[in-house]
């Protein structure tokens, strides 16, 4: 069964929803200028409200290595998701400094993009359509099996995520806008998304 990450949490209500619905991961966006941006102090407060059983993933775009490492070491986040131009040396250094799992986002337009994603020295490639377009990429590029576990993102909803899990068996599906109403996390949509993905295991 694919795991579930709900990204872009930014309020105590969001955390309350997560604590009740128990996704496998949640995400805090530290990239300035993004709609769902949270400051370090805000994230620390939200992490303190979040169930210890749910790992928090920090989303970064070209942040100084030391800052990302500090957030991991302090326990504000348990995993790092890199969305900028971070090279292999950056990722390897972060891994060596913290031992934490690392995700690296890749925009998928071709088989070559997939090859680059799966050869990059991260724990999990995150396959996406780009900068929060809310649309899926061409899933026909994917196969049933992959060289390493990956997170599938971009345009996922309660309607299409179960199909993606059934067809491609990603390690995890990553959703943000697909569980929102008017730019805010929607409890009903979060619950429906999680139930739809997890029901696959009981139906098969």
Positions of predicted regions on the chain:
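Conserved N-terminal beta1-alpha1 strand-loop-helix module at the mouth
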Residues: 1-127, 131-204
């Amino acid at each position: 069964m694919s795991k579930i990450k709900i990204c872009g949490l930014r309020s105590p209500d969001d955390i309350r929803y997560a604590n009740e619905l128990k996704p496998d991961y949640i995400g805090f966006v530290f990239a300035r200028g993004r709609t769902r941006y949270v400051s370090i102090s805000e994230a620390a407060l939200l992490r303190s409200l979040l169930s210890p059983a749910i790992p928090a993933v920090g989303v970064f775009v070209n942040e100084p290595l030391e800052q990302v490492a500090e957030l991991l070491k302090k326990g504000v986040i348990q995993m790092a998701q890199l969305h900028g131009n971070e090279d292999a040396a950056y990722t390897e250094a972060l891994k060596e400094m913290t031992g934490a799992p690392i995700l690296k986002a890749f925009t998928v337009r071709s088989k070559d993009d997939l090859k680059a994603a799966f050869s990059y020295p991260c724990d999990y490639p995150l396959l996406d359509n780009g900068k929060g377009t809310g649309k899926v990429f061409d899933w026909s590029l994917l196969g049933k099996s992959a060289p390493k576990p990956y997170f599938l993102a971009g345009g996922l909803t309660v309607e299409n995520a179960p199909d993606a899990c059934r067809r491609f068996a990603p390690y995890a599906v990553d959703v943000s806008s697909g569980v929102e109403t008017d730019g805010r996390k929607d409890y009903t949509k979060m619950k429906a998304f999680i139930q739809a993905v997890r029901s696959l295991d009981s139906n098969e």
